[in-house]
Amino acid sequence: SKTLKLEKDDRNVWKYSFEIPCDSQGTTVSWSMHDDENTAKNIGRETSLHASVLLKEKTAEMNNILAQEIPQFRCSDSKFEDIYYYLWSLHMMYYINVQKGWEMENHTQSAVNNFLGIHRYDACFQIKVGAWARNKQRFAYGNVLTWKHLVENGRYRETQNGHIFLSDNKGVGWHSGAYGGELAEHVLGAWQIYQHTGDRGFIRKCYQGYFRKVFWKNMVGFAMNDAEVGRALEKMAVISGNNSDVDHWKKRINQDPKHLRLMFDQRWEANGHKDYFMGGRNGMLMTNAFWAMRSKHFPREYAERMIHSWALNKEQGFFGEFFPLAMAKKSMSFFNSADDQSFGYTPDTAYFTLDGIFSQGFPRIASDLTLNHLKNYNFHKEWKIPVAPEAYKRDLSLFGDQYSNFNAGKILLFLEGLGGLSYSIPD
């Protein structure tokens, strides 16, 4: 093609671009990846040749999943229905079942064209989305248990004080060199799956050789969820037949109400940021202050002040062209790097922030802000169709992957936030 452009970047990574004509009849573009070049080419070629048949098969498959596997949703405003089912479609289409090496469980991913597979951070909400599918063994368990392979094979980073971190992503026999500590949130996701199933065998698999190992010496919490995770580990210990572990978790993770209140009080208005939680010394104010509201121990009076001072504030706060900006307007002029510009609005920060406001018992404010976000972030006004970009730049132009399961947390905003749904089979 005369429009094909190939070039290497400064890291010797090949990049390409091309243009193809497309009229009202449409055109087919196929993309395939395989360790063997010829196999990849043949798959792509066969897909293009049989596109119509394959499209009908995929449509039938997805219609069946959307009709039989997920909670049904209806709304007087059809665009919210479109968004809901579109986000579920992406989440479900990205499931893979490799059955090799460290990929023995069926699990979702964050993008179709992403060889990096499932991401540790993204799984914090993707695990919980899977808990709402009907077939939990197919759509829920693997999002948790696929990470166990790294622990069983000693593929983790352990600090001198006993903190264990897993890589950002992994595959059949590899893992990345970027490590982080969001696994505490995975524990709560696994517990929600148990609440929706009562499957004690699943909890045993999660606890023995995995969560017990990761948190035994020390624990890194996520957005102040330490107490909730500690309580979940105690329950998992009992369910898995490790009753003697309960005392260990009680000593390891302090759940004393006075201690918990002190942890929040010490971080309130830190570094002189009025009505703000855990603000940094450098003045970069991000939405993660709201994420801590997801803890039931977060003082509600603090939440109310922060919501009115920062969430609803269109001058200095997080209400931009819509809610929420990833960074407060007060900080944006000081932090203006290329990355800051690219990630002006992001789906993960929106989920954690709005979930926090719902959790604190402000349903009207949380609902209004959620609807504001969904109709501006996940519905294209010009195209009149749902969208799921990885991010919007500060100037509202699209950024990154345009079919991103990084938006999966919004499904939880529909079900648990707007719908207020919650259930526990064991209880």
List PLM regions with ranges.
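A glycine-rich beta-turn/hairpin centered on an aromatic-Pro dipeptide
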Residues: 412, 426-427
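Aromatic-rich carbohydrate-recognition surfaces in CAZymes
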Residues: 52, 59, 114-227, 343-366, ...
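The feature captures the catalytic groove of carbohydrate-active enzymes
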Residues: 14-48, 111-112, 159-185, 208, ...
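Catalytic cores of large soluble enzymes that bind and process phosphate-bearing ligands
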Residues: 32, 72-75, 79, 225, ...
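Aromatic/acidic polysaccharide-binding cleft in carbohydrate-active enzymes
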Residues: 367-408
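Acidic/polar, glycine-enriched structural segments that form the non-catalytic walls/loops
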Residues: 1-114, 200-207, 212-215, 235-251
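Extended glycan-interaction surfaces of carbohydrate-active proteins
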Residues: 78-117, 140-178, 214-220, 258-345, ...
